[in-house]
């Protein structure tokens, strides 16, 4: 079975495909998650060895600091899965909502995208439509920011923090930074700061293939 772009669709559940790809990789791969952690939790349930086979597990999820009690969409959508994944032994690198939200795209970026190739023009049109329908001047780039942790820390800086996972808020998975040594806390490489101008330039230069005009 093929999709509209000519790519072959794999009929297996996502968890089975991920397990096979990781186990067959010649070098430890980076596993990236930019949505609810349901599939990753299923992978770890079916094949606990995967936690030790990946170079890192990069996740966009969680919220620290002000507003943390509200939680964050990706973890809240499947709190049980989030508990399994964040409590695992996988080498997690976490890009949190409170840091990744600082990088945005807005109307100026729409025009730059539309001035590039057909694919970028399409992206610019979609961004413009989203901003108009949401009635907002800009939108945060949560996922692209978090995914830079898979490459380097040129844009998003992280530190190993002590994180509590078992905050009792029904229907949510809330994480909290706690003092070192608190029982039940886990150590996790977590985002703490972002270089917004550098990330924005990197994203737009990469997508359009050209540096910003002066």
Residue ranges and their predicted role:
Residues 1, 64-65, 126, 182:
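Generic signal for short, ordered secondary-structure residues
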